[in-house]
């Protein structure tokens, strides 16, 4: 893990020197260390961290057709509108994370713009989002 962390931090450092806004995606299968890596990076950098687990489908969105899609358990539309677009615009915003205990949206979380933004979770690199990321870690 330490070697991977050092490789990623070198890439992030270079991006931070070259760009005003940096978006990093950490994707991979369940229990592969995505959240652990994001947390380690958050200890090193002043950054925002977003979790795809906060964007599961609400009950009314859970259809056979949706679940038949690759990654169909993720609310791509809400993540794109509520988080990705404001991030790319450098705007302050808020979003409501999905609460897995109640299957509802929780209270809004306010987000201030930061130069470095990390999105972690399975399907954060889904083709639906296009190519918004400066660095993709898998």
Predicted stretch roles:
Residues 29:
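P-loop (Walker A) phosphate-binding loop of NTP-binding proteins
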Residues 37:
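Hydrophobic positions on the alpha1 helix immediately C-terminal to the Walker A/P-loop
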Residues 40:
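Active-site signature of alpha/beta-hydrolase-fold catalytic machinery across serine-
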Residues 34:
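Conserved lysine of the Walker
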Residues 105-138:
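ATP-dependent NMP and nucleoside kinases share a basic, alpha-helical "lid"
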Residues 45-60:
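Short beta-strand-centered segment that lines the nucleotide-binding/catalytic pocket of NTP-utilizing
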Residues 1-24:
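Extreme N-terminal, non-catalytic leader segments
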Residues 48, 61-106, 116:
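Conserved nucleotide-sensing/catalytic segment adjacent to the nucleotide-binding pocket
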């Amino acid at each position: 893990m330490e070697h991977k962390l050092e490789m990623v931090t070198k890439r992030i450092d270079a991006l931070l020197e070259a760009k005003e806004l940096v978006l990093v995606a950490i994707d991979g299968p369940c229990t592969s260390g995505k959240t652990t890596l994001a947390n380690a990076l958050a200890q090193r950098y002043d950054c925002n961290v977003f979790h795809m687990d906060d964007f599961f489908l609400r009950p009314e969105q859970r259809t056979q057709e949706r679940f038949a899609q690759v990654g169909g358990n993720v609310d791509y539309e809400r993540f794109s509108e509520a988080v990705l677009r404001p991030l790319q615009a450098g705007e302050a915003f808020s979003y409501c994370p999905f609460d897995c205990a109640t299957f509802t949206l929780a209270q809004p979380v306010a987000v201030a713009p930061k130069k470095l933004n990390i999105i972690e979770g399975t399907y954060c690199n889904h083709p639906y989002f296009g190519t918004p990321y400066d660095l993709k870690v898998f």
